């Protein structure tokens, strides 16, 4: 998830002096990462507001084709998570959220969804300068509205057009 660099310090580890980023992570956890290998460890700048909107756009799309075999699907999603690409992580959140609504998830996929969502939330909190609760609600609303848009059966009487609003269809009575 997202953290904040609070300091850069020189430390001697195994008789070698190095510069370290001191990162403060959620839950007041501090992590030291050598500055020389920061990129290799996936350290990057937090996304900006424009990129945050692109993340929300990914959440608002229909799910992408997923492997039917849960083991292969799990590995594919794990690779997306490990990539550190925020858009790939948003893809995992959306796809697993849709699958959870339709068929439910295995214990492993539930945990993956939780972890992916936490990564998204932690990044969007910084990008949007919002609270965790606000961002969680934003993500949930976006997923619910996109699920309703792409998965609502056209044969239903009422259809959720967007989060919180219902559009009733006119059905003529031939009686």
Map each language-model feature to its residues.
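Charge/polar-rich, low-complexity and marginally structured segments
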Residues: 42-155, 161, 175
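Short, intrinsically disordered C-terminal tails of secreted or membrane-associated proteins
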Residues: 169-174
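A positional/architectural concept
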Residues: 1-41
């Amino acid at each position: 998830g997202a953290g904040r660099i609070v300091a850069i310090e020189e430390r001697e580890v195994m008789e070698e002096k190095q510069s370290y980023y001191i990162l403060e992570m959620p839950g007041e956890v501090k992590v030291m990462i050598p500055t020389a290998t920061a990129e290799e460890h996936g350290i990057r700048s937090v996304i900006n507001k424009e990129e945050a909107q692109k993340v929300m756009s990914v959440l608002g799309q229909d799910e992408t084709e997923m492997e039917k075999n849960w083991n292969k699907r799990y590995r594919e999603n794990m690779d997306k998570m490990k990539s550190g690409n925020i858009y790939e992580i948003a893809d995992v959140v959306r796809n697993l959220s849709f699958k959870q609504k339709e068929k439910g998830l295995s214990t492993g996929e539930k945990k993956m969804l939780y972890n992916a969502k936490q990564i998204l939330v932690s990044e969007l909190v910084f990008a949007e300068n919002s609270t965790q609760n606000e961002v969680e609600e934003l993500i949930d609303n976006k997923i619910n509205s996109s699920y309703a848009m792409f998965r609502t059966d056209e044969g239903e009487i009422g259809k959720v057009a967007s989060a919180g609003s219902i559009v009733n269809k006119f059905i003529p009575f031939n009686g």
